[in-house]
Curated annotation (Swiss-Prot):
It catalyses: 2 (2R)-3-phosphoglycerate + 2 H(+) = D-ribulose 1,5-bisphosphate + CO2 + H2O; D-ribulose 1,5-bisphosphate + O2 = 2-phosphoglycolate + (2R)-3-phosphoglycerate + 2 H(+). The modification N6,N6,N6-trimethyllysine is found at K5. Its main location: plastid. The modification N6-carboxylysine is found at K192. This is Ribulose bisphosphate carboxylase large chain. Binds 1 Mg(2+) ion per subunit. InterPro entries: RuBisCO, RuBisCo_large_chain_AS, RuBisCO_lsu_C, RuBisCO_lsu_C_sf, RuBisCO_lsu_fd_N, RuBisCO_lsu_N_sf, RuBisCO_lsuI. Its cofactor is Mg(2+). It comes from Drosophyllum lusitanicum (Portuguese sundew). Heterohexadecamer of 8 large chains and 8 small chains; disulfide-linked. The disulfide link is formed within the large subunit homodimers.
Amino acid sequence: GVGFKAGVKDYKLTYYTPDYQTQDTDILAAFRVTPQPGVPPEEAGAAVAAESSTGTWTTVWTDGLTSLDRYKGRCYHIEPVAGEENQFIAYVAYPLDLFEEGSVTNMFTSIVGNVFGFKALRALRLEDLRIPPAYTKTFQGPPHGIQVERDKLNKYGRPLLGCTIKPKLGLSAKNYGRAVYECLRGGLDFTKDDENVNSQPFMRWRDRFLFCAEAIYKAQAETGEIKGHYLNATAGTCEEMIKRAVFARELGVPIVMHDYLTGGFTANTSLAHYCRDNGLLLHIHRAMHAVIDRQKNHGIHFRVLAKALRLSGGDHIHSGTVVGKLEGEREITLGFVDLLRDDNTEKDRSRGIYFTQSWVSLPGVLPVASGGIHVWHMPALTEIFGDDSVLQFGGGTLGHPWGNPPGAVANRVALEACVQARNEGRDLAREGNEIIREASKWSPELAAACEVWKEIKFEFPAMDTL
């Protein structure tokens, strides 16, 4: 007879190993598992470990040709989720051998590739990953990182200011370039292509790049400050994307942009390598993230997508605004903001961080706060995000009643006032409105902005809770 017993397997015999001591080289994952009724949590956790590593649904004779113990994923711990009836956190350890070096694509294909459609589970969410230094070291990471970016821009001791050019679709290249110039001239550091501005019939990419470069150089000459515009290089093919990045380099501009989730991790990593080799900064937009991360019970939490981006490479990434939202969300957001910027992040479940993560000096990424923010938010943003961040006011600049340059002036004055107040030891959380009011006495542009946006709020209950 053959040396194995055919039939459908009980996963937990092989893949649930509560005594396992995790190794420093393992990739560790925390999954939020919602089993189907009647499926015990150990079996569900083991099934996740199996299906995302070596397992298949039945015994196969080729199993005998490998060392299962060396290659299998292991569910090594399960804990119930407080306040949920039938939900568990399953911790899975994957041996490093299972992953291709320097490939975020392969890491995700392995860990989340197949298992999310698994019938024994009602829902599954990847909450966090621990990437071991041995794997991190196979990635280049961000093209430049926070310190190099500050040195390139010669801007220190404050957050950077940006603005997304609106209306996002329909402007001609010349009018688009004019809006870029006006915002930069007024005092912003950066302007931004919207994520869906690629190369459409009303504005082809090459024309846009040219007029934006002209706007940058004119604003630089007049202000004596270094300026940038995130030229979106996202395209339908990797070749076309690199072609756009090459043209940006030829124009001598400082920064390009990519939509890393719609563009894909393979394209993103290629672009990040090009950017480091050619001295371009890389701004990353997270279009499509909410499709993946918004459901509490199913999908992938954004902190995992943020870690993946730091491996794949990007110098800025959009990461929520916190402002006007609830407390719990603030802690969770700051959790992954720290993951992006710091060298080491300690395990802290109150902030949604399941594992201590060391980045072994991989450069950090600047978090970008963007979407529905205006001058009244400036004290809170300065306090929450600190100096190492990019604050982006699209409508909050272009919506100014006197036009774009005064809109930019208002934001810059508000920021400088908040930074100065903080440096003088004032409490931004408590005195924020007062600080903005005082500054607006000296700046009619800011006073007008304060008047327009005094009633605007975007308050809804938090989605992202522990």
